[in-house]
């Protein structure tokens, strides 16, 4: 099973892509086998420090294989590398969760 996380500003497919990994409001988990999505609220969005690391720990817990975001901090990168979670960086300010899913399918 392949699960991809897309960082998002909201909890639906029309929400804008959020380029901030640790400070993204939501994480959309897309399951490529079922074409299903599940949204998880980022509980650490307002953490004074360590938001990226805590987000990375959540990704490990969710057993995702890759993450699409705009920026990963050094500590988050280190943890994601340790668990072989692929990090894909895109810088598209106009993308929605749905447009990114559509790109993955093509």
Where are these regions (language model features)?
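Non-catalytic interface/targeting segments
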Residues: 1-50, 81-106
């Amino acid at each position: 099973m392949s699960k991809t996380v897309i960082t998002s500003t909201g909890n639906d497919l029309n929400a804008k892509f959020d380029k901030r990994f640790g400070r993204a409001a939501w994480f959309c988990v897309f399951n490529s086998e079922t074409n299903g999505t599940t949204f998880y609220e980022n509980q650490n969005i307002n953490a004074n420090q360590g938001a990226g690391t805590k987000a990375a720990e959540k990704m490990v817990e969710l057993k995702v294989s890759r993450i699409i975001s705009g920026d990963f901090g050094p500590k988050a990168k280190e943890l994601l590398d340790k668990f072989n979670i692929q990090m894909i960086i895109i810088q598209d300010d106009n993308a929605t969760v749905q447009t990114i899913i559509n790109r993955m399918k093509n």
